[in-house]
Amino acid sequence: MSTTEKPQKATQRPDGRFSLGIFAATLIVLALLLGGLLIVANVWTDVQWYSQLKAVRVFWTQWGWAVALGTVGLLLVGGAAYLNLMLSRRREGGSTTGAGEYRQYAEDHPWLARLGLPLAVGAVFGAPLASEWRTYVLWLNRTPFGQSDAQFGKDISFYVFTLPVLHSILGLAVIALAVSVAFACVGHYLYGGVRQEDGSMVLATRARVHFGSLAAIGAILVACYFWLSRYDMLLAENKKFSGASFTDINASLPGITILSLAAVL
């Protein structure tokens, strides 16, 4: 009498890396939910408090400006990251000599590499612009003081309202440039614009043009920094008085002006 034994199904143990990925994703989702609940609770509390004062419009004005500026910062920094990543891609056909494994991963996950990563970088480095909403609102509602400084002949309101906005814009531009350089380096490394040959670093023509353009933008930003530093002198705090000293006006100011012009040239 023959007996037939049913083959037993092999039980596969779950992959450890897969389980760890699920656990990490669960923690991230829970953290996002908790953070969202805290934000909603704080917003609701503030709305109720401002409503009691019959000034809820003030609250929505603050939040509206914060959200708008945060979105602008995110899009500018994220857009700079995306643009430089796309510019570093190899347009002509043929094989590349960059990091093939990483390049293939980026090509297999285009939404993550070309959209998700730039947006994440923009959220981290650009969205904090939202915290400077007061600076921009004050600038939009500025009024002249009717008195000018003795050195540059600018109305005092320029130093109170306009100069902080210019510094904020310059700071955001520097962040965008730093992100651009980082993504350009990564992109050219992936697509063969930057490679090693015989122990030395070789830059393709497109990489040289790309980095040269970024260097030119950096020089312009340096010139802007030196130019704004001229006005910052009048706001300096010295040991005995506030404002620019004799040395600042007669020695430092001409030197900074020359540095600003030299950075552009």
List each model region and its residues.
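Contiguous transmembrane helix-bundle modules in multi-pass membrane proteins
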Residues: 3-48, 53-154, 163, 167-265
